[in-house]
Design a protein with these regions (language model features):
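Flavin (FAD/FMN)-binding glycine-rich loop and adjacent Rossmann-like elements that form
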Residues: 1-198
Protein backbone atom coordinates (compact mmCIF):
# COMPACT_ATOMS: atom_id res chain seq x y z
CA UNK A 1 0.00 0.00 0.00
CA UNK A 2 2.76 2.45 0.95
CA UNK A 3 6.30 2.98 -0.38
CA UNK A 4 8.01 1.70 2.77
CA UNK A 5 6.16 -1.63 2.38
CA UNK A 6 6.98 -4.34 -0.14
CA UNK A 7 5.20 -4.30 -3.48
CA UNK A 8 3.70 -1.53 -5.55
CA UNK A 9 2.71 1.62 -3.56
CA UNK A 10 -0.99 1.89 -4.45
CA UNK A 11 -1.39 4.91 -2.19
CA UNK A 12 0.95 6.99 -4.35
CA UNK A 13 -0.35 5.61 -7.65
CA UNK A 14 -3.58 7.66 -7.55
CA UNK A 15 -2.49 10.27 -5.00
CA UNK A 16 -3.85 13.70 -5.92
CA UNK A 17 -2.46 15.62 -2.95
CA UNK A 18 0.85 14.98 -1.16
CA UNK A 19 1.31 16.92 2.07
CA UNK A 20 5.10 16.59 1.74
CA UNK A 21 5.05 18.91 -1.30
CA UNK A 22 4.22 21.91 0.89
CA UNK A 23 6.42 23.82 3.32
CA UNK A 24 3.47 25.31 5.19
CA UNK A 25 1.81 22.70 7.39
CA UNK A 26 -1.33 21.31 5.79
CA UNK A 27 -3.85 19.62 8.03
CA UNK A 28 -5.73 17.67 5.38
CA UNK A 29 -3.13 14.92 5.02
CA UNK A 30 -2.48 13.12 1.76
CA UNK A 31 -5.40 12.45 -0.57
CA UNK A 32 -5.57 9.51 -2.95
CA UNK A 33 -8.23 8.12 -5.24
CA UNK A 34 -9.13 4.47 -4.77
CA UNK A 35 -9.33 3.27 -8.37
CA UNK A 36 -7.54 -0.02 -8.00
CA UNK A 37 -8.12 -3.53 -9.38
CA UNK A 38 -9.31 -4.57 -5.90
CA UNK A 39 -12.47 -2.49 -6.24
CA UNK A 40 -13.20 -3.25 -9.88
CA UNK A 41 -16.80 -4.43 -10.09
CA UNK A 42 -17.38 -6.87 -12.93
CA UNK A 43 -20.43 -8.87 -11.83
CA UNK A 44 -22.82 -7.17 -14.21
CA UNK A 45 -23.33 -4.59 -16.90
CA UNK A 46 -24.92 -1.14 -16.70
CA UNK A 47 -25.50 -0.86 -20.46
CA UNK A 48 -28.39 -2.43 -22.34
CA UNK A 49 -30.10 -3.50 -19.12
CA UNK A 50 -33.21 -2.29 -17.31
CA UNK A 51 -33.01 0.72 -14.99
CA UNK A 52 -33.55 -1.60 -12.05
CA UNK A 53 -30.67 -3.86 -13.13
CA UNK A 54 -28.40 -0.85 -13.69
CA UNK A 55 -29.16 0.58 -10.24
CA UNK A 56 -28.53 -2.83 -8.65
CA UNK A 57 -25.05 -3.04 -10.18
CA UNK A 58 -24.19 0.58 -9.35
CA UNK A 59 -25.24 -0.05 -5.74
CA UNK A 60 -23.18 -3.25 -5.55
CA UNK A 61 -20.17 -1.44 -7.03
CA UNK A 62 -20.44 1.18 -4.25
CA UNK A 63 -20.66 -1.59 -1.66
CA UNK A 64 -17.51 -3.19 -3.07
CA UNK A 65 -15.62 0.12 -2.77
CA UNK A 66 -16.89 0.64 0.78
CA UNK A 67 -15.92 -2.95 1.68
CA UNK A 68 -12.38 -2.42 0.41
CA UNK A 69 -12.17 0.84 2.33
CA UNK A 70 -13.37 -0.85 5.52
CA UNK A 71 -10.80 -3.62 5.04
CA UNK A 72 -8.05 -0.99 4.63
CA UNK A 73 -9.16 0.69 7.87
CA UNK A 74 -9.53 -2.48 9.94
CA UNK A 75 -7.74 -5.52 8.50
CA UNK A 76 -5.03 -4.58 5.98
CA UNK A 77 -1.72 -6.01 7.25
CA UNK A 78 0.81 -3.39 8.35
CA UNK A 79 4.64 -3.70 8.41
CA UNK A 80 4.61 -3.42 12.23
CA UNK A 81 2.45 -6.56 12.49
CA UNK A 82 -0.72 -4.65 13.27
CA UNK A 83 -3.87 -4.56 11.22
CA UNK A 84 -5.64 -1.73 9.48
CA UNK A 85 -5.09 1.96 9.00
CA UNK A 86 -7.81 3.55 11.17
CA UNK A 87 -6.67 7.06 10.17
CA UNK A 88 -7.97 6.58 6.63
CA UNK A 89 -11.23 8.36 5.97
CA UNK A 90 -13.52 9.16 3.09
CA UNK A 91 -13.48 12.81 1.96
CA UNK A 92 -16.94 14.14 1.03
CA UNK A 93 -15.45 17.65 1.02
CA UNK A 94 -13.00 16.70 -1.74
CA UNK A 95 -15.41 14.78 -3.98
CA UNK A 96 -18.50 16.91 -3.38
CA UNK A 97 -20.67 13.97 -2.32
CA UNK A 98 -22.37 13.07 0.95
CA UNK A 99 -20.63 9.70 1.26
CA UNK A 100 -17.13 10.58 0.00
CA UNK A 101 -17.42 8.30 -3.02
CA UNK A 102 -17.15 9.57 -6.59
CA UNK A 103 -20.14 11.35 -8.12
CA UNK A 104 -20.41 8.71 -10.82
CA UNK A 105 -19.13 5.21 -11.36
CA UNK A 106 -15.95 4.92 -13.40
CA UNK A 107 -16.78 2.79 -16.42
CA UNK A 108 -13.42 1.36 -17.29
CA UNK A 109 -14.21 0.36 -20.85
CA UNK A 110 -16.95 2.07 -22.81
CA UNK A 111 -18.26 1.35 -26.24
CA UNK A 112 -15.87 2.36 -28.98
CA UNK A 113 -16.54 3.91 -32.35
CA UNK A 114 -15.79 2.19 -35.64
CA UNK A 115 -13.14 4.69 -36.59
CA UNK A 116 -11.44 5.61 -39.82
CA UNK A 117 -8.32 4.18 -38.17
CA UNK A 118 -8.22 1.59 -35.37
CA UNK A 119 -5.11 1.59 -33.17
CA UNK A 120 -3.79 -1.95 -32.72
CA UNK A 121 -1.24 -3.44 -30.31
CA UNK A 122 1.43 -3.49 -33.02
CA UNK A 123 1.20 0.33 -33.16
CA UNK A 124 2.42 0.71 -29.56
CA UNK A 125 4.38 -2.47 -28.83
CA UNK A 126 8.19 -2.36 -28.47
CA UNK A 127 8.22 -5.70 -30.31
CA UNK A 128 7.10 -3.97 -33.52
CA UNK A 129 8.64 -0.48 -33.22
CA UNK A 130 12.38 0.08 -33.04
CA UNK A 131 12.46 3.88 -32.79
CA UNK A 132 11.59 4.01 -29.08
CA UNK A 133 8.11 5.36 -29.80
CA UNK A 134 4.96 3.87 -31.16
CA UNK A 135 3.83 4.09 -34.77
CA UNK A 136 4.25 7.54 -36.34
CA UNK A 137 0.99 8.91 -37.77
CA UNK A 138 0.97 11.77 -40.26
CA UNK A 139 -2.37 12.94 -38.83
CA UNK A 140 -1.30 12.88 -35.16
CA UNK A 141 -3.15 15.25 -32.83
CA UNK A 142 -1.79 14.25 -29.43
CA UNK A 143 0.61 12.09 -27.47
CA UNK A 144 0.38 9.64 -24.61
CA UNK A 145 2.40 7.18 -22.57
CA UNK A 146 0.91 4.36 -20.51
CA UNK A 147 1.26 0.60 -20.38
CA UNK A 148 -1.43 -1.69 -21.74
CA UNK A 149 -3.28 -2.13 -18.48
CA UNK A 150 -6.19 -4.59 -18.51
CA UNK A 151 -8.05 -5.42 -15.31
CA UNK A 152 -9.88 -8.69 -14.55
CA UNK A 153 -12.93 -9.34 -16.70
CA UNK A 154 -16.36 -10.90 -16.25
CA UNK A 155 -14.91 -13.99 -17.93
CA UNK A 156 -12.43 -14.32 -15.06
CA UNK A 157 -9.30 -13.31 -16.93
CA UNK A 158 -6.76 -11.85 -14.53
CA UNK A 159 -4.91 -8.54 -14.56
CA UNK A 160 -2.62 -7.88 -17.53
CA UNK A 161 0.09 -5.22 -17.78
CA UNK A 162 2.10 -5.08 -21.03
CA UNK A 163 4.82 -2.56 -21.83
CA UNK A 164 3.81 0.03 -24.42
CA UNK A 165 5.97 2.72 -25.98
CA UNK A 166 5.12 6.43 -25.82
CA UNK A 167 2.56 6.89 -28.57
CA UNK A 168 0.79 9.37 -30.80
CA UNK A 169 -2.96 9.81 -31.11
CA UNK A 170 -4.01 9.72 -34.77
CA UNK A 171 -6.88 11.94 -35.88
CA UNK A 172 -8.32 8.98 -37.79
CA UNK A 173 -8.98 7.22 -34.47
CA UNK A 174 -11.23 10.11 -33.41
CA UNK A 175 -13.34 10.17 -36.58
CA UNK A 176 -16.16 7.63 -36.85
CA UNK A 177 -16.92 5.90 -40.13
CA UNK A 178 -20.37 6.62 -41.58
CA UNK A 179 -21.10 9.66 -39.38
CA UNK A 180 -20.48 13.36 -39.95
CA UNK A 181 -19.78 16.18 -37.47
CA UNK A 182 -18.68 13.98 -34.57
CA UNK A 183 -15.28 13.56 -32.92
CA UNK A 184 -14.78 10.86 -30.32
CA UNK A 185 -12.65 11.35 -27.23
CA UNK A 186 -11.39 9.42 -24.22
CA UNK A 187 -12.03 5.71 -24.08
CA UNK A 188 -14.43 5.53 -27.02
CA UNK A 189 -11.89 6.32 -29.79
CA UNK A 190 -10.84 3.77 -32.40
CA UNK A 191 -8.89 1.25 -30.35
CA UNK A 192 -9.08 -2.48 -29.79
CA UNK A 193 -9.84 -3.98 -26.38
CA UNK A 194 -6.07 -4.35 -25.94
CA UNK A 195 -4.97 -0.83 -26.95
CA UNK A 196 -7.87 0.70 -25.02
CA UNK A 197 -5.81 -0.30 -21.98
CA UNK A 198 -3.24 2.42 -22.71
CA UNK A 199 -5.22 5.06 -24.64
CA UNK A 200 -7.10 6.94 -21.95
Amino acid sequence: LFREETGFPLWEYRRIFAQSNYQTPVTTGDITLMNWPQNDYFLGNVYDVSSQEKEKHLYQAKQLSLSLFYWLQTEAPRPDGGKGYPGLKLRPDVLGTKNGLAKAAYIRESRRIKAEYTIVEQDVSPDFNEAGTGKFYDDRVGIGSYSIDLHPSMAGRTYLDIKALPFHIPLGALIPKDMDNLLAGCKNIGTTHITNGCYR
